[in-house]
Amino acid sequence: GRAAHAGIEPEKGRNAIEELALKIVKLRALNDFDRGSTVTIGTINGGENRIVVAESAEMDIDLRYRTKEDGEMLIRQVRDILEQAEIHGVRTEYTFTRNRPPLVQVEGSAQLQRLVEEASQELGIPYLTAVTGGVSDGNFVADIGTPTIDGLGPVGGMMCSPEEYLCLDSMTERIARMGTVVGWLGCLADVGRS
């Protein structure tokens, strides 16, 4: 943008905050919750004083997607929005950093899930499958072709909010299930070696 006094000659300024605000509206329109593709503006900062047209502003955007193809498409769409100036004379610089690849099903994932379901039944523990936009180190493991299931820890909810909670009662049963699955995997590995 370009700084200018907000009271004396605001027309000479180019407001970087307004530029981001206009881009945010377009970025928000990219959300496709059914598909699992989301764009979240996590932080925004700009300007130096209320009486000065903001010369600069910055924001952090979080992108989530379920497949690599959806991720590539979403990144292209975001890039197109960022590269288009909404206010004449304002320039946008951006950097993409990848945090985690999407958690994908690989060969062996279905068999691993069946083991978890069987252990849940044997122990009388409810087992529900769900697709979320959450991530873990498991995303990296799945990305290299290792069967991975995420979300087997204790029950909780309202993540990243003041109301976030954890059900302590669920920890024992979840540990038991994990122990059962790991034990079965060990037995399968022993059978495979003999």
What are these regions (language model features)?
Residues 2-194:
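Metal-dependent amide/peptide-bond hydrolase catalytic core
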